[in-house]
A protein has these predicted regions:
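Accessory "access/gating" subregions that flank catalytic or transport cores
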Residues: 163-184, 193-203, 212-217, 231-347
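Sec-dependent signal peptide recognition
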Residues: 2-11
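Acidic, carboxylate-rich catalytic segments that either coordinate divalent cations
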Residues: 268-311, 364-434
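Mature, well-folded catalytic/scaffold domains that follow N-terminal targeting or propeptide regions
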Residues: 35, 39-40, 166-177, 182-190, ...
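C-terminal motif of bacterial Sec signal peptides marking the signal peptidase cleavage site
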Residues: 17-19
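Extracytoplasmic mature domains of secreted/periplasmic and thylakoid-lumen proteins
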Residues: 110-112, 116, 126-187, 198
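Catalytic phosphate/nucleotide-handling subdomain of diverse soluble enzymes
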Residues: 48, 52, 59-83, 219-222, ...
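Active-site-surrounding "flap" and adjacent substrate/cofactor-binding loops of secreted or lumenal enzymes
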Residues: 55-101, 116-118, 140, 150-153
């Protein structure tokens, strides 16, 4: 009997150990310290890319309609004189403005812009209201308090329309409903919500839940789908897979996110078309010219913005700027400097794709690697009051503090929403795989 008893004990111990191993494999462990550095990299990379892309914003939109801007920029224009945008008249002297990286030294301060300030506001609101999912009234309260009522308030198209509706007492998601907001298919949601992906590491399905109402505040249809694509990419940036390069990593993230685009809609077709151009070996300028011809001249794949005769031929539209962003995504190959350069020269709302990829790549490689790539030490100070209002400390913040605030959001999401754990001894998160 003792032999059988010992065998039973050994078998039970084996089953217990197997169960422990399985439970360990059911969790993904992420360093909170490393993640904080990555969030710093997100804000720094996004700021560099945003301010660089702003130099050429709306300089080049094509030659359809009343506004014609001539040939698009090419790599030969990098370092050259910045041409006038569609808003600038002949009285503006731009002879001393060059198309080059826009950087801030340690003594300077990064200013906010519409590609960073709404994300900053949403992070602030999540902690202010101690929640993981903002309610319609919380979003409206935040917009009314932190966005200036009078121009210049750095809102455009759908964001401005949603803000006007909020001031009339209308709550999200009705502010993005096509019957209320004729700009629902513009770019706005895809440049204001990417950060929600970083609040739900490795779990894009919950990131989409967090971002759903902020996205629907200004977008529907394909514009909503594009915004969700970016959110998904940012969530998958925390995946535990091992890659040989940032290029391999970001291409995997992109292809995984592509699986959730509807094959019947133009975002998926734009993705597949642009990826095919990249794989064909043609230069990025040829790829950019091809998407211009296909989507704005020929109106293929159901993208018919040109037929609507909009101002600047819909240069603010979600679709053409998404296609443009894919050019810098693929051809940038995960190199932050190369990606920002291509995005800046690609045309249309050039600060939008650059900001998105600058932030994502900045997150992937972190603060130190960004500074190594640019061979400089950057400012960590950030002035949210350049474009928004009513934040603490007269709007002066730092990337260190902004990263710490992001960690607070993730802590709450991991424990309360993902049913994971915070290991304060190891300073890690244990996040269930599902």
């Amino acid at each position: 009997m003792s032999v059988f008893k010992n065998l039973f004990i050994l078998w039970s111990l084996f089953l217990f150990m197997s169960s422990c191993n399985n439970n360990t494999n059911d969790f993904i462990e992420i360093s909170r310290e490393k993640y904080s550095n990555q969030l710093y990299g997100f804000w720094l990379g996004q700021s560099i890319a945003n301010w660089t892309g702003l130099i050429t914003e709306m300089d080049k939109i094509g030659n359809i309609g009343d506004i014609k801007t001539g040939s698009f920029y090419t790599r030969e224009d990098w370092g050259g004189i910045d041409l006038r945008s569609i808003w600038e008249d002949q009285s503006i002297d731009k002879s001393n403005i060059r198309i080059d990286y826009s950087l801030r030294s340690e003594e300077e301060v990064w200013g906010s812009d519409d590609d960073t300030d709404i994300e900053y506001m949403y992070q602030f609101l999540l902690n202010y209201f101690d929640t993981s999912i903002l309610s319609p009234s919380q979003i409206r309260e935040g917009w009314i308090k932190h966005i200036k009522a009078e121009e210049e308030n750095y809102l455009w198209v759908s964001n401005q329309r949603a803000f006007d509706l909020m001031n009339q007492g209308i709550l999200p998601p009705e502010t993005g409903e096509p019957s209320n907001n004729e700009f629902y298919n513009m770019i706005d949601a895809q440049l204001t919500t990417e950060i929600f992906g970083l609040f739900s590491p490795t779990r894009p399905e919950f990131a989409i839940r967090m971002a759903e109402l902020p996205i629907k505040t200004t977008a529907r249809g394909e514009a909503q789908e594009i915004a969700e694509f970016y959110v998904r990419m940012h969530s998958l940036a925390s995946n535990p897979k091992e890659f040989n390069s940032t290029k391999e990593n970001i291409f995997w993230i992109a292809n995984e996110s592509r699986k959730y685009l509807s094959d019947n809609n133009y975002p998926a077709k734009m993705y597949d078309f642009t990826e095919g151009l990249y794989n064909s070996g043609i230069k990025w300028e040829q790829a950019r010219d091809s998407i211009y011809s296909r989507y704005q001249v020929e109106q293929k794949d159901g993208y018919d913005i040109t037929s609507k005769n909009l101002y600047c031929n819909g240069c603010f539209a979600a679709g053409i700027n998404f296609a443009s962003s894919l050019v810098s995504l693929f051809y940038g190959e995960g190199d932050i400097k190369k990606t920002i350069k291509i995005g800046t020269l690609s045309g249309w709302d050039s600060d939008n794709p650059t900001s998105t990829w600058g932030g994502l790549i900045g997150f992937l490689i972190g603060k130190e690697m960004i500074e190594r790539e640019f061979n400089t030490n950057f400012s960590s100070k950030f002035n949210i009051h350049r474009t928004r209002q009513n934040f603490p400390n007269k709007g002066i913040d730092s990337f260190i503090h902004m990263a710490a605030e992001g960690i607070k959001v993730v802590d709450r999401v991991v424990e309360e929403e993902l049913k994971g754990e915070i290991n304060l001894i190891k300073n890690t998160w244990l996040i269930p795989v599902k």
